[in-house]
Amino acid sequence: MKVLVIEDQTMVRELLALACKQALPKAGVRTAGTRADALALCREAPPELVILDLVLPDGDGLDLVPELFALAPSAKIIALSSHIDEFTLHRALSSRVHGILDKNEQPVRILREAITAVLDGQQYVSSLVQRLKASVRANPAAFDKILSDREQGVLRLIGEGLTNDQIATRLKISASTAKNHRLNIMAKLDMHSTPQLIRYAIEKGFTRIPEGPPRS
């Protein structure tokens, strides 16, 4: 079996690779620290199992999932992050990944459990992620129940501080349509200003605040 670990932190990457070797002693395990390196390795030899960190120095891990499936259609993908928020959970569940893990839960142990589960055809969601999932499901005001996919995309850009004109350019829509989306989002969330929307976008995980220099 070919396994690819995609993780930018060197120590964590080595620990995850070790966990894969322990769970699958006969597997060939390769590692990548960036999105670009991961895609290059996938083109050389499509993996059957991918361990994917969702925060990479050269791109969003979940944005990488469709490209991984294009290069390795039958691969099992286990996503992991130390920042599982509502929007990340929603995107991960919609992306067809086979496992979602929170790094704050003894990642080596739960990774071994996840590998066993996904290779057996199951979906694996770690306990902290399960709790968040249950909380979102029980909340009638959860964003995925009241905002359309397009509105979620617009909110993500609002969280980045983009104007209506900039959103229109990014999404290839008219500025008036972008404005209408903004107003509809405000109405649905019962908010009355762009700063409120930006705070909400950050709180729910639509937008991330940079955490300083790249990790080694």
Question: For the regions a protein language model found, what residue spans apply to each?
Answer:
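Recognition helix of helix-turn-helix DNA-binding domains
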Residues: 161-196, 203
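Short, flexible helix-to-coil linker/hinge segments that flank and couple to helix-turn-helix
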Residues: 89-145, 149, 153, 206
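Active-site residues of response regulator receiver
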Residues: 53-54, 81
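Acidic catalytic/metal-coordinating carboxylates
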Residues: 34, 60-63
